[in-house]
Each structure stands twice: as C-alpha cells, then as structure tokens.
Amino acid sequence: MVRTLFDTNILVDYLNGIPQAKTELTLHTDKAISIVTWMEIQVGVAPADQVVLDLFLLGFTVLPIDTPVSVKAVELSKSTRIKLPDAIIWATALVNQRLLIARNSKDFSPSAQGVLVPYII
C-alpha cells in the first residue's frame, strides 16, 4: 500500500468534478494532505459548501509543518525555485515518506523525487 499526500490541485479538481481526480483518489487508501493544502482549500470554499468540504476532508490525515518539514522546504525552495507553499507540501511528503500526487507539472516535475503527476488538464 502506497502512502500518499495529495497536492491542493488534485483536491480542487475532485471538488470540481474532474474525472481523473476522482479516479486517482479512489486508487489510494492511506491519504494525507499538508496543513497548507487544508488552508488553501478552506480559503476557497463558499459558506454554503463548508459542510460538504468538511466531510470530504475527513478522508485525509492532515500533516503539520514541523521543524524537519520546514528545513526540507527551505532546501527545496532554494534548490528548485518553487514557491514556498509548494515546497512545504513537497517537503511534507518527503519527510513523512509519502508519495506526493500533484497535477502541477510546472512546479512538480514528473521525474522529481517522490512525485507522481497522474494527469494533466
């Protein structure tokens, strides 16, 4: 069983009804998100959709930003020039030994360490 961490764009795609995101999410049982993804999703939700979002997010373990994640995020941001929120998400996956599943191939190359880009839209 692969332990996964989903990037924000996969969750947004799922909530917007993108079939590839629904398929990808059903393939995995040990699913997590970074607290950064949790915050990004919360900021974008309409009040009328809050309950649905909260129920959806119960299917994920929310991983915090701790010192090892912070150190790794700074290292990734400096070496790859990706934005800090993306570096934090990637670092969270690496430090917690999870496969990062992301659609943003601009920031997360399909050949990057510990990253899977399952589809592009």
Give, region by region, the residue ranges found by the protein language model:
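Alpha-helix capping/helix-boundary segments
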Residues: 10-11, 37, 69, 88-89, ...
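Short active-site oxyanion
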Residues: 28-30, 59-61, 95-99
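Short glycine/serine/threonine/alanine-rich loop segments
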Residues: 78, 82, 98
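Short, well-structured N-terminal submotif of metal-dependent ribonuclease cores
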Residues: 1-33, 42-54, 58
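Acidic, PIN/NYN-like endoribonuclease modules and their adjacent C-terminal/linker elements
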Residues: 18, 90, 94-121
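Acidic catalytic patch
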Residues: 58-79
